[in-house]
UniProtKB/Swiss-Prot annotation:
One of its GO terms (biological process) is queuosine biosynthetic process. It comes from the Bacteria. ATP binds at F12, S13, G14, G15, Q16, D17, S18, A19, T20, C21, L22. This is 7-cyano-7-deazaguanine synthase. Catalyzes the ATP-dependent conversion of 7-carboxy-7-deazaguanine (CDG) to 7-cyano-7-deazaguanine (preQ(0)). It comes from Hyphomonas neptunium (strain ATCC 15444).
Length: 239
């Protein structure tokens, strides 16, 4: 089955990376839809950010507003029932015996892409876009390029469809991700990401920093804030 490559389905959580990927997709495809997943995460703040980001992006550009289509919310609560992680249960963030942070939810991205692929086939969409990245901190195995290549092949075979997975942030660090947002949508998109997206593992929205809201000390906040500072330092040093 041939799927059109002029359309994309963005895995959109409401965080910095997926918001940047949404802008990236709107810059490249004729029709863009979004898909989000409620998997029983400890803090639903990201999910609450999703409609705000979509609405703000519509206001930023009439061209993007015309391209941005339907949003789909999927119940993936089965992930929480499989076992405790720091993303789904009230446990402290730590390293596991396997050498991975316990913020890793086993199988999460594999399930997300499977569900997104099934929806894309029904919607006549040929490209799935995800904000996975193997450059920064986590080392999550389901964020690696090899994993996504294998997942793409599995979807193509299992769905008999010419589906492609694009991961525009795969080899970018957080500083480069901020720069990409600037290139795609200028100061307006950078400001939108800072104000409306959410990354903090602890769900903190009370403290506003230059880079956005968060506790400032969890691994996700440190990654985002350090990336912001490196980006700012790079701009200041530029001739």
């Amino acid at each position: 089955m041939t799927q059109p490559i002029s359309s994309a389905l963005v895995l959109f959580s409401g965080g910095q990376d997926s918001a940047t990927c949404l802008a990236w997709a709107l810059d490249r495809f004729d029709r863009v839809e979004t898909i989000g997943f409620d998997y029983g995460q400890r803090h639903a703040i990201e999910l609450a950010c999703r409609p705000k980001v979509r609405a703000a992006i519509r206001q930023m550009s009439p061209v993007w507003a015309e391209k941005l289509g339907e949003d789909h919310m999927i119940d993936a609560g089965v992930l929480k029932s499989l076992g405790a992680t720091a993303m789904t249960h009230e446990v402290e963030i730590s390293m596991t015996a396997a050498g991975l942070p316990n913020t890793f939810v086993p199988g999460r991205n594999l399930l997300f892409f499977t569900l997104a692929g099934a929806l894309a086939v029904r919607r006549g969409i040929g490209v799935l876009v995800g904000g996975m990245c193997e450059t920064d901190y986590s080392g999550y195995p389901d964020c690696r390029a090899d994993t996504l290549k294998a997942q793409e092949q599995t979807l193509r075979l299992g769905l008999d469809a010419d589906i492609r997975i694009d991961a525009p942030l795969m080899y970018l660090d957080k500083a480069a991700t901020w720069q990409l947002a600037q290139e795609l949508g200028g100061d307006a998109l950078v400001a939108l990401i800072g104000e409306e997206t959410h990354t903090c593992y602890l769900g903190e929205r009370g403290a506003r920093h230059d880079w956005g809201y968060g506790c400032g000390t969890c691994p996700a906040c440190e990654l985002r804030s350090n990336g912001w500072q490196r980006w700012q330092d790079g701009k200041a040093a530029a001739p």
